[in-house]
């Protein structure tokens, strides 16, 4: 510390030497020229390459982002289209099912009407046959009754007996 104080007292540091300034500046300029010739070019080219690399990475990132957005939009469009197509298919299937149900219902109603009409026709035919048979039987019985009446002279008791006999015969012939 003592030596520092002596140098300060002598004015060595506060009075710069012009020769020392010249040689220091000259050395600095020489080092600067040497560095410019040897190191400055590679440093700048390395910085430029690094800047190009960073810009290229940024460009690739933007391109990838744009492609991803395009793919996302395409996928959304495809999904919307698929949803619309699915809705259309479901709607068409419901329409076909409703039409098929209506057709089957109409066919079933037609078939039941035919069966009912056929059954009514059969019933009507059976009714006519039964009435024909009944008329024939009644006519036969009336003829037989008339024959009996004609053969004998009837009083009131005999008439009742003949009618009762005819009723019994009709009941027996039906069974």
UniProtKB/Swiss-Prot annotation:
Similarity section: Belongs to the ATPase B chain family.
UniProt cross-references to InterPro entries, sorted A to Z: ATP_synth_B-like_membr_sf (IPR028987), ATP_synth_b/b'su_bac/chlpt (IPR002146), ATP_synth_F0_bsu_bac (IPR005864), ATP_synthase_B_chain (IPR050059)
Protein role: F(1)F(0) ATP synthase produces ATP from ADP in the presence of a proton or sodium gradient. F-type ATPases consist of two structural domains, F(1) containing the extramembraneous catalytic core and F(0) containing the membrane proton channel, linked together by a central stalk and a peripheral stalk. During catalysis, ATP synthesis in the catalytic domain of F(1) is coupled via a rotary mechanism of the central stalk subunits to proton translocation. Component of the F(0) channel, it forms part of the peripheral stalk, linking F(1) to F(0).
Topological relation to the membrane, as annotated: Single-pass membrane protein
Regions that span the bilayer: 14-34
Residues in coiled coil: none
GO cellular component: plasma membrane; proton-transporting ATP synthase complex
Chief place where the protein resides: membrane
Keyword tags: ATP synthesis, Cell inner membrane, Cell membrane, CF(0), Hydrogen ion transport, Ion transport, Membrane, Transmembrane, Transmembrane helix, Transport
Organism this protein belongs to: Chlorobaculum tepidum (strain ATCC 49652 / DSM 12025 / NBRC 103806 / TLS)
Classification via SUPFAM superfamilies: F1F0 ATP synthase subunit B, membrane domain
Molecular-function annotations in GO: proton-transporting ATP synthase activity, rotational mechanism; proton-transporting ATPase activity, rotational mechanism
Lineage, opening ranks: Bacteria, Pseudomonadati, Chlorobiota, Chlorobiia, Chlorobiales
Self-association state and partner proteins as the record states: F-type ATPases have 2 components, F(1) - the catalytic core - and F(0) - the membrane proton channel. F(1) has five subunits: alpha(3), beta(3), gamma(1), delta(1), epsilon(1). F(0) has four main subunits: a(1), b(2) and c(10-14). The alpha and beta chains form an alternating ring which encloses part of the gamma chain. F(1) is attached to F(0) by a central stalk formed by the gamma and epsilon chains, while a peripheral stalk is formed by the delta and b chains.
Protein name: ATP synthase subunit b
Localization terms from the record: Cell inner membrane
Pfam family, one: ATP-synt_B
